[in-house]
């Protein structure tokens, strides 16, 4: 009797680590070749962060948020590989990313989610242009394999770019951009460089995508495909994740020794990609749409990621106030700083929520697209306010976070006792807890890791200039002009094509109404069990 095979099981964090041992990528870190990515201490904090996205999918408290049912297969998949088909799905994704980044600072796997959405939209667009179904079927087969194997995909989008004043085909060195060097009946061969690839060493596969809108002369550079991380001809030159095993000025890094992020420069040297893994190969006129789709999804997701980091700063700031002997609720100067920090974090996160609620179904695919205005406003706010977030954490904490004696003094019999007595601020908080809170904030905001969070917040997902461009491109300025001209009872110009009225946004605050959120709606969020018990 024939029986159906059971559906694939979602991996745990331990399964993910073990799966990495089945790959043999060519990875260099700090000038040495890595024998086993899964076992290398320099990469462990990054692997820990990704592993948490697997473990949370198995915890009853988090599983409703961290898993979803894939409509095209009916299977339960990890939220990070699921395609959103409603505004509720976008909200669930937002909360899931905030959850995992509260624990890890940056869980990285959400890039998989964003890239799969962009390629789904691209594939449907290509099929509609050709009148066929080949691209959609190809992508769906790949998607189901990724979901069934519970893979983590890296996004290889940012090219080395070379001379920024020249287009890809004009570069003196063509390998500053990834491009197609050969086509045959079995697939394509690509060469070139992707300069900034998040988590590259400990991904299962890389999704190669164009980083800009290509012209007809750049057709060979318009390429999107999936490449196993250990493909022949691929070399990854990476930096360590976090600060594993490194003694800093104020002791071991309390957070970044556990969680961090590696990035890698990916060098492609005649890497063969079979056609079933190719999603764009020379269709230059669609490259800009792919880049735009990914950027919109990713900028909304970044909002949630940095809100999770903001939660860490809010909690650490409140702890430091307490350790210093103050109740921020009773001290106006501290309360004002804490409320400003909360306002920043929840303010840009609210833009992510709005981007979900006002999201729209893609005109070609079944997936939902976040509203680009709110997605870009939220990302712009977090990019520029990350420095204020650090400043506020520093203000409520005091200078102790960078002036503490080193941890060796904690064990020096000639100084430890006296330091414990004189550096204790509150009778209710032991000295050891005060210095631990101080060193935690130092790690997050005032050391290497703090600078790293600032830069990835500013430039990750695109520069502030790119976000401002998208906000202006999509914001309905024309509707506002019409409003004022109607109140003035006359138009200032009879030209309907004048520049300031080109941008219009149907469906929001207009006759057609807002787009329906769709189903399923947002799942119930996990409750804080500690808070519930104390209440």
For each predicted feature, which ranges?
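Internal helix-loop-helix
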Residues: 55-153, 205
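A short core secondary-structure module
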Residues: 193, 197-247
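Gly/Pro-rich turn-and-neighbor structural signature
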Residues: 124-189
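Long, well-ordered mid-to-C-terminal structural blocks that present hydrophobic/aromatic surfaces
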Residues: 309-312, 316-388
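N-terminal-proximal low-complexity accessory segments that begin disordered
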Residues: 3-56
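Glycine-rich beta->alpha junctions and the first turn(s) of the following alpha-helix
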Residues: 249-344
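Buried hydrophobic positions in well-ordered alpha/beta secondary-structure cores of metabolic enzymes
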Residues: 31, 190-192, 268, 338
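Alpha-helix capping/hinge segments and adjacent helical runs
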Residues: 373-518, 523
């Amino acid at each position: 009797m024939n029986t159906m095979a059971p559906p694939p099981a979602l991996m745990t964090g331990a399964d993910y680590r073990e799966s990495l041992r089945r790959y043999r990528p060519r990875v260099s870190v700090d000038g040495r070749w890595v024998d086993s990515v899964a076992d290398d201490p320099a990469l462990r904090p990054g692997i820990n962060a990704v592993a948490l996205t697997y473990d949370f999918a198995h915890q009853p408290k988090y599983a409703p948020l961290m898993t979803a049912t894939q409509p095209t297969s009916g299977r339960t998949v990890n939220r990070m590989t699921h395609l959103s088909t409603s505004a509720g799905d976008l909200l669930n994704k937002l909360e899931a990313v905030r959850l995992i980044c509260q624990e890890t600072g940056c869980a990285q796997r959400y890039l998989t989610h964003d890239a799969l959405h962009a390629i789904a939209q691209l594939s449907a667009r290509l099929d509609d242009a050709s009148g066929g179904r080949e691209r959609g079927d190809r992508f769906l087969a790949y998607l189901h394999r990724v979901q069934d194997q519970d893979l983590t995909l890296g996004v290889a989008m940012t090219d080395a770019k070379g001379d920024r004043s020249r287009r890809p085909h004009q570069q003196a060195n063509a390998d500053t951009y990834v491009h197609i060097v050969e086509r045959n009946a079995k697939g394509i061969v690509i060469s070139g460089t992707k300069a900034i690839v998040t988590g590259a060493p400990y991904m299962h596969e890389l999704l190669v995508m164009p980083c800009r809108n290509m012209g007809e002369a750049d057709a060979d550079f318009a390429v999107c495909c999936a490449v196993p991380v250990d493909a022949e001809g691929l070399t990854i030159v990476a930096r360590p994740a976090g600060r594993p095993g490194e003694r800093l000025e104020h002791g071991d890094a309390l957070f970044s020794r556990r969680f961090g992020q590696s990035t890698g420069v990916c060098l492609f040297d005649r890497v063969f990609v079979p056609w079933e893994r190719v999603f764009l190969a020379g269709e230059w006129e669609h490259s800009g749409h792919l880049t735009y789709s990914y950027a919109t999804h990713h900028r909304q997701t970044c909002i949630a990621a940095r809100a999770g980091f903001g939660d860490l700063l809010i909690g650490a700031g409140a702890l430091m106030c307490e350790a210093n002997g103050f109740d921020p609720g009773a001290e106006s100067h501290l309360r004002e700083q804490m409320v400003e920090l909360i306002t920043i974090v929840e303010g840009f996160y609210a833009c992510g929520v709005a981007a979900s609620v006002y999201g729209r179904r893609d005109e070609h695919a079944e997936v939902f697209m976040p509203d680009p205005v709110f997605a870009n406003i939220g990302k712009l706010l977090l990019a520029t306010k990350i420095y204020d977030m650090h400043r506020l954490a520093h203000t409520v904490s005091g200078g102790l976070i960078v002036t503490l004696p080193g941890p060796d003094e904690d064990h020096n019999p000639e100084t430890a006792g006296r330091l414990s007595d004189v550096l204790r601020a509150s009778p209710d908080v032991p000295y050891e807890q005060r210095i631990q809170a101080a060193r935690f904030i130092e790690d997050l905001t005032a050391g290497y890791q703090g600078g790293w969070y600032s830069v990835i917040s500013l430039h990750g997902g695109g520069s502030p200039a790119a976000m401002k461009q998208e906000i202006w491109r999509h914001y309905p300025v024309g509707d506002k002009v019409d409003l004022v001209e109607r109140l003035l009872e006359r138009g200032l110009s009879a030209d309907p094509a004048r520049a300031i009225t080109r941008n219009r946004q149907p469906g929001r605050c207009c006759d057609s109404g807002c787009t329906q959120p769709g189903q399923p709606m947002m799942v119930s969020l996990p409750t804080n069990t500690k808070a519930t018990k104390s209440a």
